[in-house]
Amino acid sequence: MGEFFYRIRQRMRTHVLDKCKVDASATQLDLPRSSVIENPTAHLHYPIFEKTVDVFKPIDWHLDVSTGQTFPMSFAHKIDIRSDRYGSAKHVWEVNRLQFLLHIALLYKKGRNEKYLELFRYHLTSWKNANPYMVGVNWYSNIEVNLRLICFYFCWQVLDVEQLRSSNAEFDVFVSKVWLPLVFEHAEYSYNHPSLYSSANNHLISEYAGLFVAACCWNIPHRKARLKYAKAGLEREILLQNTSEGVNREEAAEYIQFIDDFFLIAAVVGCRAGIAFSDSYNGRLHAMASYMNAMLDCKCNYPMYGDGDDGFVLRPDEGGHFNNFKSLLVSFAVYFDDASFKRADVMWDDKNELLFGRTGREKFVRMPAVAAGFLMDDNSFYPESGHFIFKRTKGVAVSGLRETYLHFDAAPLGFLSIAAHGHADALSFILHVDGDPVLVDAGTFTYHTHKDLRRYFVSTLAHNTVCVNGKNQANQAGPTMWLSHYHCKVLNVGDNFVEATHDGYRMEGVEHVRRVEFNRDENEITITDTLRCSKPAEIEIPFHLHPAVSAEIQGSVAVLSVAGIKKVQMGLDPKLSYAIRDGGWYSEHFGEKTESSALYAKTNVDGFVSFETKIKVLE
């Protein structure tokens, strides 16, 4: 009943009280002159997923750059963002996170060239004019509001605003009339639109983090109360949304870097403000950092289970693809003074300079790097969380680091009742060899647009597990909503094996048990699928290939090659007839997809049946 009344109150807030605050006719401020904007040869194309926006030119803040469609200038909560009607809200929001402003602020700081300060003022004034409070799609989502608050904070620090205000009268007026009013509007929105109950996932974390950072920096209304509220929320959610083993409960690997950054940034900003978080907070954050480190292969690639949307909390660079996991290893090494996070191939970067400054940089430089393969040449099992990572890593004189990496997923579907960012991937596995993805999760590609593709990417058949009767292991009720969650159960765990089952096909009369065993001496993985059927069923078993992998099948043996080099030999069960099946999709980054293929078998089963697959990683 609590959620029922929360939804009523939320509806009252978003459709009645918020509407009273709409002022679409708000006074338009004069745009400051910008020599960069006026220069026809000046361009900086900032990546927005598969597209770009030229941040050295005026920006249409409501344009979806992926379709050319524009979202309406109407009451925010009435705008349809869950269809293709106006295009992709996700692309609009990515522009309006304003993270490119931090890059512009850094350009100003490095050379004190006034043209970049002009450009900063121009864009933020333009944004305020185009986004009156509660008008337009950029006031729809609270996570977007809080990402802007965090961006505002770091821009404020980079520009050294208080000093700049005292020496630059125009900038002082800009801060008073544009920037601070925006900060206060964002802080008000953040507090008044909490994501609770079934929505209390990473969105709620962002809301507490953004409000906490704002209250640490600015004299927002009710500052002390807001600070207390936000800090308490962060302390609570870090324990609720992450297991004691440090695994995030949303079951979306790419989101881990996003969520870890919210908690880390809040802790760092709190330290600057003299506000320390508890030992339990820091202990759980360290466990999260340790899982993240174990989850990464020897090239810091992550297993792409669950949703991923290339979202970042803090981006000081020119945008584009960025391995924030590597950056976070540096951050955690410094924050915890823990050299186990300093892999040999991680480097100091601008993001960590913003977080820790010269003191942190000097600490990191003094810290010894972990030897290649050390601490990675071992399995990392998280039975409470349902994640199992098999690793064999060694240095080879000629070819460098060699690694066999397999991630096995026996985890819940996702977090809370809707499991928004989980995929129907029970008992799926992902294989990397020498840091190259070989057998892969299909990825994400989209949320609310291209509905057929959304259904494909989250489906059971798009993962390396057994699909029964062409159905998903859970029922998808919407793009980010699952019903009838399956439950996984770990049956047996040893040093080099795990066996687990799930009940996602109970209505089909089928129980699937999968055993994964790693023979480290032979560098061979054996996967045994056992099906107990109370009635006849049709099953499909795919092994999805990374687009860079080619495959050849001869009888019951498949050989997989990466860039022409033979990497893997698969012994396929002779009871099944495997073929190379085209027509699949792989999405390494949100908004991008490429065609892919899979080793694929289909058969009818009844009663008790077992299939064995042997995966031999070639030396």
Identify the function of each model-found stretch:
Residues 1-83, 90-92:
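Extended, charge-enriched "interface" segments that sit outside catalytic cores
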Residues 59-65, 376-378, 386, 527:
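Beta-sandwich/jelly-roll carbohydrate-recognition scaffolds of carbohydrate-active enzymes
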Residues 65, 99-102, 392-394, 412, ...:
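Short, flexible loop/turn elements at secondary-structure junctions
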Residues 68-286, 301:
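Aromatic-lined, polymer-binding surfaces characteristic
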Residues 92-93, 140, 145, 419-423, ...:
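Short alpha-helix boundary/capping segments
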Residues 96, 207, 288, 384-386, ...:
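Residues that flank catalytic or metal-binding motifs in active/ligand-binding sites
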Residues 146, 308, 315-318, 322, ...:
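CBM-like, beta-strand-rich accessory domains located in the C-terminal region of large
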Residues 251-439, 491-493, 499:
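Carbohydrate-active enzyme catalytic cores, enriched for enzymes
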